[in-house]
Amino acid sequence: MTTVQHQVFAACPPDRVWALLADLEAVQHYNPGVRHAAVEGAQRSGVGARRSCDLLPKGRVVERVTHWEDGRAVGLEVAESDWPIHFMRWVTRVEPQGGGACITQSLEYQVKFGPLGWLLDRLVMKRKLTATLDAVFASLVRHAESGAASRPEGRT
């Protein structure tokens, strides 16, 4: 199993960050790799809620909420995808800090394909995933600080 940790600061109230995280469809606004996100079913929040994400340049993933602390933390897991993983799950937390918000995430996953998957993870996947999440968190912070919900420039 591989773990990836992130911590960033947003110069805005924590509730602004939480509003973006708690709206499961808002990921399409701050994640540059998501073309469109939609809640599946009637449940829009809390443990058991699901969202599907159409990805750029192609692909689709379905995620399920596994952890919910209103105003503070949301955890998700990949429920369906064609990625070469046995599982991927994460918890993102928001805490007040110095007049702003500290955002932390702990993500863990297991790559398929035994020793070959382990090697692929060490050589490519962890580095690529970390870089992707760096971009996601930078965009999340920009959106939270500006209060914007518009799509990143150049997105369709």
Q: Language model features by range: what are they?
A:
Residues 142-156:
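Generic C-terminal helix-cap and adjacent flexible tail
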Residues 49-56, 75-81:
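Short beta-strand segments that buttress and anchor functional surface loops
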Residues 3-5, 59-63, 86-90:
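Short, surface-exposed coil-to-beta transition loops
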